[in-house]
Amino acid sequence: GYSLEDAFRHPVYPALAFLTAPMNCPVEKINAAAFGEMLSRARQMFDYVFLDAPAGVDAGFRLTAQFADRFLVVTGAGPAAVRDAARVGELLELAGKTNAKLIVNRVDKDLLSTVRLTIDDVMDAAGLPLAGIVPEDPHVTLAASFGQSLLRYSPNCKAAKASRRIARRIQGFHEPIALR
């Protein structure tokens, strides 16, 4: 199995570490108690621990939801994605997990206008308060293609600025929410 000692330290951001899920181990075979113990140790080592659950509400979602204390539900603005976000919000609420917020990703302001949809509509449909909006931005794909962090590749692009605002909100700072 993996341990915190296996965490990969980012070469550019040494305070950032990643521990990826094992590719050859189905979520159903992960020992929930051991996973919880590892997260307890991680919480002592790091200021923030993010668990990236797979899309949908399968075993990966249930495992991470069991141990997380705050949730960022990331969705697109399309109808199917918003329905999935609403389902995730409902399941979290049923589990007594009420500290969930919504990030609407890859938002195309012109497309939203064309289909007469607003971010408020997305929030209402998902039933979650908004943590942030990340606009559609080709720099995201370019940065990934070149194996670089978006914040290094194009620090002033729209998606990078939106990501920084979301990070500051997570840290408790007041940052305006706007689709720019």
Q: Positions of the model-derived regions?
A:
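Short histidine/acidic/glycine/proline-rich micro-motifs that form metal-
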Residues: N24-C25, R106-D110, N156
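NTP-binding/hydrolysis catalytic cores, primarily Walker-type P-loop NTPases
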Residues: S145-R180
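Short, surface-exposed alpha-helical recognition segments that flank or form part
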Residues: P26-I30, G76, A80, S154, ...
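Amphipathic alpha-helical transducer elements in NTP-driven molecular machines
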Residues: G1, E5, A32, G36, ...
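P-loop/Walker-type NTP enzyme "switch/lid" segment
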Residues: G1-Q44, V140-R152
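Conserved catalytic-core segment of NTP-binding enzymes
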Residues: A33-E136, L142
